Swiss-Prot record:
Protein name per Swiss-Prot or TrEMBL: Phospholipase Culp4
Entry keyword Glycosyltransferase: no
SMART domains: Cutinase
Activity regulation (UniProt): Inhibited by high concentrations of paraoxon. Inhibited by tetrahydrolipstatin (THL), a specific lipase inhibitor.
Molecular-function annotations in GO: carboxylesterase activity; hydrolase activity, acting on ester bonds; lipase activity; phospholipase A2 activity
UniProt keyword annotations, A-Z: Cell membrane, Cell wall, Disulfide bond, Hydrolase, Membrane, Secreted, Serine esterase, Signal
Signal peptide: 1-45
The keyword Cell cycle belongs to this UniProt entry's keyword annotation: no
Gene assigned in the entry: cut4
Cysteines engaged in disulfide bonds, as pairs: 47-117, 191-198
Organism: Mycobacterium tuberculosis (strain ATCC 25618 / H37Rv)
Catalytically driven reaction(s): 1,2-dihexadecanoyl-sn-glycero-3-phosphocholine + H2O = 1-hexadecanoyl-sn-glycero-3-phosphocholine + hexadecanoate + H(+); a butanoate ester + H2O = an aliphatic alcohol + butanoate + H(+)
Active site: 128, 195, 207
Summary of the function given for this chain in its UniProt record: A2-type phospholipase, which is probably involved in the degradation of macrophage membrane. Hydrolyzes dipalmitoylphosphatidylcholine. Also shows moderate esterase activity and hydrolyzes the p-nitrophenol-linked aliphatic ester pNP-butyrate (C4). Does not exhibit cutinase activity.
Length: 226
């Protein structure tokens, strides 16, 4: 009997990274079907009660992306708190290794906010390749991916919730859940039935169908935690 690689082994991580790469490439092929999203409004001056740090999906213009914008709009409707936003700065193209650029940018911003706005509750989110970006930020560093800005342990307390949509790690061995148990209870990881990026389905429309049902669901989850 051939032994299977265990979840924290180098072989397991390398295999998960390869599977994520192929899934993100597939998401890129479907990205042309996405509607052009509105850019996120700028956050108000000073430190907000909460801030959403969101990584958009493959092929979307800079900003929060369509799913991120809908999620933030719903969250604002469900709470009387001030909600700031930050769109993760990364290429969001077909090169999965560029997701590490987004992870470094998100981590740097999270650490800046934790230092400058200590009372602000941080919400991390991502759609499709953007969900993989957040996986990298919150997971143990993966060798060879170019992630060089791991979060210090003190940052964990500032992260109130994580909302992920169409996450490729759902088909790559559950990367996030295996490596980041401390965030498990804070995370809502949504996958549409039939979405080929996060499940074994083959319905590309499912990958584009997170608004408004699941963005509202995620907003309800997050609103109770900020």
């Amino acid at each position: 009997m051939i032994p299977r690689p265990q979840p924290h082994s180098g072989r397991w991580r390398a295999g998960a990274a390869r599977r994520l790469t192929s899934l993100v490439a597939a998401a890129f092929a479907a990205a042309t079907l996405l509607l052009t999203p509105a850019l996120a409004p700028p956050a108000s001056a000073g430190c907000p009660d909460a801030e959403v740090v969101f990584a958009r999906g493959t092929g979307e213009p800079p900003g929060l992306g369509r799913v991120g914008q809908a999620f933030v709009s719903s969250l604002r409707q469900q709470t009387n708190k001030s909600i700031g936003t930050y769109g993760v700065n990364y290429p969001a193209n077909g090169d999965f290794l560029a997701a590490a650029d987004g992870a470094n940018d998100a981590s740097d911003h999270i650490q800046q906010m934790a230092s400058a706005c200590r009372a602000t509750r941080l919400v991390l989110g991502g759609y499709s390749q953007g969900a993989a970006v957040i996986d990298i930020v919150t997971a143990a560093p993966l060798p060879g991916l170019g992630f060089t800005q791991p979060l210090p342990p003190a940052a964990d307390d500032h992260i109130a919730a994580i909302a992920l949509f169409g996450n490729p790690s759902g088909r790559a061995g559950g990367l996030m859940s295996a490596l980041t148990p401390q965030f498990g209870s804070k995370t809502i990881n949504l996958c549409n039935n039939g979405d080929p990026i996060c499940s074994d389905g083959n319905r590309w429309r499912a990958h584009l169908g997170y608004v408004p049902g699941m963005t509202n669901q995620a907003a309800r989850f997050v609103a109770s935690r900020i």
